[in-house]
Amino acid sequence: MKLLALSLASLASAATITRRADFCGQWDTATAGNFIVYNNLWGQDNADSGSQCTGVDSANGNSVSWHTTWSWSGGSSSVKSYANAAYQFTATQLSSLSSIPSTWEWQYSTTDVVANVAYDLFTSSSIGGDSEYEIMIWLAALGGAGPISSTGSSIATVTLGGVTWNLYSGPNGSMQVYSFVASSTTESFSADLMDFINYLVENQGLSNSQYLTHVQAGTEPFTGSDATLTVSSYSVSVS
């Protein structure tokens, strides 16, 4: 759906990067520290009208600050984009991972939108293979935005990283999606994302032989106007 092929051939320099011009093309990107920041308007054809631009404010190694501004109307049940910061790392088997520490500080300019703010992780049974599992961690479900779900109801409630989450499950094409949705909007977040993976391994049958292939963080808008997500600080690492 929103997964983009990420080149791991060369990691970005850890040199500090300062603010640059916004980019507005459907598939425009910017390399920023150890991230690729995507505009990623993958669902724009579902809108009657709209546009979106994304920009990098600063970056240094495993930390990045960025923003995205959008207006979308029509297609109220469809996601229009997933502007995100995608961390660049070598795909690693879950059983070999020990920690994925992350912090995220963000703010939306308005709450009069239908959108989420969410991590998006993908796993595959082989390096370079098709994604089989999608793990979303929703820090916000604004304006009634909801996750993929087979039943429309959560399958569990769990507290991880000091936040209570409702867990949903359902298919996205050939992938199985697990979505942890925060019980209340969380604009300041600090946790080890490995805790979410371990929960799924221990309680939902996710195999630890899967490879973690992508770690992304961004926003999925459905509808709204003149909305800006500002990520004042975001960091993540995989080890």
UniProtKB/Swiss-Prot annotation:
UniProt protein name: Xyloglucan-specific endo-beta-1,4-glucanase A
Gene3D superfamilies xrefs: 2.60.120.180
Gene field: xgeA
Superkingdom of origin organism: Eukaryota
Catalysed reactions, as listed in the record: xyloglucan + H2O = xyloglucan oligosaccharides
Alphabetical keyword list: Carbohydrate metabolism, Cell wall biogenesis/degradation, Glycoprotein, Glycosidase, Hydrolase, Polysaccharide degradation, Secreted, Signal
Signal peptide: 1-14
Location, primary (coarse class): secreted
Residue positions with a glycan: N172
Thermal dependence: Optimum temperature is 47 degrees Celsius.
Localisation per UniProt entry: Secreted
Family: Belongs to the glycosyl hydrolase 12 (cellulase H) family.
Recorded effect of pH on activity: Optimum pH is 6.5.
